[in-house]
Amino acid sequence: MGRRGFLMAAGGAAALAGCGGMAAREDLPFDAWDNHCHIGGGPGKTPAERVDNLLKLADRVGVERLCLHLGLQIGVEDPPPEQIRQDNDAVLEAVRFAGDRAVGYVYLNPNHLDFSLKEFDRCVRDGPMVGVKLWVAKHCNAPELDPIVRRAAEQKAVVYQHTWMKVGGNGPGESTPFDVVELAKRHPDVRLLCGHAGGDWERGIRAIRSTKNVLLEIAGSDPTSGFVEMAVRELGADRIVYGSDVHGRSFASQLAKVRGADIPDAAKRLILRDNLRGLLEPIMRAKGLL
């Protein structure tokens, strides 16, 4: 049963209006697509319950579509194949429940390359997922990433790489924006998403500036004054993608980075919606999701 059917069964049209369902959403200015959402954390025992809670929050702040990845258990840095499959199954369940409000990115581990390529085929080529999530198992400049990027490009799937630059040093397999640049230069026709702007966003912005096929994702840090303004100035608004990293962060604090930035409204629309929609549109249309 999908989310709408669940709400109807729980109380009919009145329930839809009362808990942020379709009737209540019609008057909201849905202007954001969120690249970075997790069903790990937050209330609910099942993937369906957790994504339903996320959508109720999204309804309140004007987020139209969620990109889900990683599954219910977040924190296993180098997961074995069985864990990866469980995580992806949880996202598949959440996406089925959410209907047209959510899409999924397949979580892959380059340390298990053969399995990861098969998992990509299961979830993306032969399934409903539309992108790839790479986290901290292996530096993304490693050669094992090349087959994954090529497979994603064949299906026009988005490739998202977590990045950070930690004061105390990154984890053993944790990538930086500089690693993403190395990978991007080996695949100049593929557009890559550099997650979290590297954490240290001033360095992250400069690191990717000259590599035009790398886009900056701004999820998961405090809404610091000047962050988005600098990114627009150095990269152009067409290379920036909004994400929240909910439940790790709130929708509201992350939207505030863009909605409160001193940039034109046209730039805000690109960042909040149009850039991500443009990346996803080819594969979503091919799958009948748009």
Go through each PLM region and give its residues.
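Mid-to-C-terminal alpha-helical segments outside catalytic/metal-binding sites
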Residues: 4-31, 35, 48-65, 121, ...
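Catalytic pocket-lining loop regions of alpha/beta-barrel enzymes
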Residues: 127-131, 138-241, 286-290
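Active-site gating/metal-coordination segments in enzymes
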Residues: 64-65, 78-167
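Histidine-centered catalytic micro-motifs
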Residues: 32-42, 160-163
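Acidic/histidine-rich helix-loop elements
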Residues: 38-49, 75-82
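Active-site beta-loop-alpha junctions enriched in small/polar residues
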Residues: 38-40, 71-73, 107-111, 135-137, ...
